[in-house]
Curated annotation (Swiss-Prot):
GO molecular function annotations of the record: 5S rRNA binding; structural constituent of ribosome
Gene from which this protein is expressed: rplY
Keyword Ribonucleoprotein included in the entry's annotation: yes
Xref: HAMAP family: Ribosomal_bL25_CTC
GO cellular component: cytosolic large ribosomal subunit
Protein name: Large ribosomal subunit protein bL25
Alphabetical list of Pfam families matching this protein: Ribosomal_L25p, Ribosomal_TL5_C
GO biological process assignments: translation
Keyword vocabulary terms for this entry: Ribonucleoprotein, Ribosomal protein, RNA-binding, rRNA-binding
Role this protein plays: This is one of the proteins that binds to the 5S RNA in the ribosome where it forms part of the central protuberance.
Length: 201
């Protein structure tokens, strides 16, 4: 397990104008911590520290320690607002983590055995990913770093759905809980192969 930590300052100058000044003047990112039994807290983070943290995919599915004014808040990343053209973070939302209380977080999918999948190796198909992350609900101690999608037995024309995923103990998919069994990945006939067969006919 990697430790993820950020240092933050309490932000008292609030509002959109203040947020713009913060980003422009000192390379700081405005953020808010909310949830649990405490009031929301406005904070500011060094942009370079946040950018470095986000380089690690696992940061999105780990409990982070945010140090604010001598106290540590355990949080998960809830939402990031990015610049539409340049991609850097404009604002961050963090949700407090309370031991014994379920949280929701976005966890990346790791696709395995793609090259050796039946539909690829034996049938010449191509894999498409419909989604690359899922929202999970679990206790903080059960939060997985990622969820594997095993493509080994998938054939051409078959689709992997959320209900096909093997989840760690204590982890639920939010979409499934709401009755939405979304497609995750599929293997379809190669366009080149389909064109060749069409020409042969």
């Amino acid at each position: 397990m990697t430790d993820f930590a950020l240092n933050a300052e309490v932000r008292s100058d609030l509002g959109k104008g203040a947020s713009r000044r913060l980003r422009r003047n000192v390379s700081m990112v405005p953020a808010v911590i909310y949830g649990g039994d405490k009031a929301p807290q406005s904070i500011s983070l060094l942009a370079k520290d946040l950018a470095k943290l986000l380089e690690n995919e696992a940061a999105f599915s780990h409990v982070l320690a945010v140090n604010v004014a001598g106290a540590t808040e355990n949080v998960v990343i809830k939402a990031l607002q990015r610049h539409p053209a340049k991609g850097f973070v404009l604002h961050a939302d963090f949700q407090r983590v309370v031991a014994g209380q379920k949280l929701t977080a976005h966890v990346p999918l790791h696709f395995i055995n793609e090259a050796t999948a039946v539909g690829v190796k034996q049938q010449g198909g191509e894999i498409s990913h419909t989604i690359n992350e899922v929202e999970v609900s679990c206790l903080p101690k059960d939060l997985p770093e990622f969820i594997e999608v095993d493509m080994a037995a998938v054939e051409v024309g078959q689709t992997v759905h959320m209900s096909d995923l093997k989840l760690p103990k204590g982890v639920e998919l939010v979409a499934l809980a709401h009755g939405n069994d979304l497609a995750v990945s599929n293997i379809h006939a190669s366009r080149v192969k389909a064109e060749d067969e069409g020409a042969a006919e």
